Amino acid sequence: MTENSDKVPITMVGPEDVEFCSPPAYATVTVKPSGSPTRLLKVGAVVLISGAVLLLFGAIGAFYFWKGNDNHIYNVHYTMSINGRLQDASMEIDAANNLETFKMGSGAEEAIEVNDFQNGITGIRFAGGEKCYIKAQVKARIPEVSTGTKQSISELEGKIMPVKYEENSLIWVAVDQPVKDNSFLSSKILEFCGDLPIFWLKPMYPKEIPRERREVVRSSAPSTTRRPHSEPRGNAGPGRLSNRTRPSVQDDEEPFNPDNPYHQQEGESMTFDPRLDHEGICCIECRRSYTHCQKICEPLGGYYPWPYNYQGCRSACRVVMPCSWWVARILGMV
């Protein structure tokens, strides 16, 4: 009886007493191995899924960014034949920044012209040059490059465009002193010029030009409107005040050309600012593009009349489109 009274019935042992029956080491070994691999697998799965989602959104964003830039920037490459020598050139239209950039040549012969239509400033610089040149131009707003614009410009791709220099063409000569306060210049032009000193360009004509220009202005001053259709083309002087002819000092004696819409006076509502033609931005009477080169020269002291007032001329060339195309596509006015 004494031996039986010392025994504890199994039914008297509660659930809390089971913990004390198990060794501590055994409990530790069974808990840790079962939880650690599962947690690592979950973290790895979350990282992989997050990375895949980020890559997907990045690809979508890059696609739309590229697609958006394609509507704002368009490049075309062509070749110019200057005095029998071929040179590579390119034109870039950046509608987002309202810029038009022309490049000619490469290496030490490279010339770059940037037209800032937002602020009405043109910047020109040459490779290896010690100056950056600016001149005023018309202000405009470049629309997005549409499919029609691309098709029109793509006709220049791969073509060899001859360059014709006119002996009595306008010459741009830098002023003596650089610009001291450049706060009026946009960040685009300042970035384009970099650390180079900036000089204004002033137009100058060769020796025989001033007298002819004065005669042209006198002959065209009484009438600033377009010439009537019945009037012969050879009777009116090609002055700058005429809105139907190119500002040139040469005699305008072209025969009637039925293929030229300006000879037929089609589209009476389409008139152009002569400054567009005079500054080489577009050609009023042209139906096809051509290459326009302008001479950028350094001032030379001494006697004023030509050729003693400038030296060291270099050429900067660009494509000039017909004004009908330029106004419709670039200015977006038509």
Curated annotation (Swiss-Prot):
Transmembrane segments: 46-66
Residues covered by region (Disordered): 212-268
Gene3D superfamilies membership: 3.30.390.150
Taxonomic source organism: Rattus norvegicus (Rat)
Record-linked Pfam families: BRICHOS
Role description: Bifunctional growth regulator that stimulates the growth of cultured chondrocytes in the presence of basic fibroblast growth factor (FGF) but inhibits the growth of cultured vascular endothelial cells. May contribute to the rapid growth of cartilage and vascular invasion prior to the replacement of cartilage by bone during endochondral bone development. Inhibits in vitro tube formation and mobilization of endothelial cells. Plays a role as antiangiogenic factor in cardiac valves to suppress neovascularization.
Gene, per the UniProt record: Cnmd
GO process annotations (BP): cartilage development; endothelial cell morphogenesis; negative regulation of angiogenesis; negative regulation of endothelial cell proliferation; negative regulation of vascular endothelial growth factor receptor signaling pathway
Glycosylation site residues: N243
Taxon lineage: Eukaryota, Metazoa, Chordata, Craniata, Vertebrata
Tissue expression: Detected in cartilage, cardiac valves and valvular interstitial cells (at protein level). Expressed in eye.
PROSITE patterns: BRICHOS (PS50869)
Name used for this protein in its record: Leukocyte cell-derived chemotaxin 1
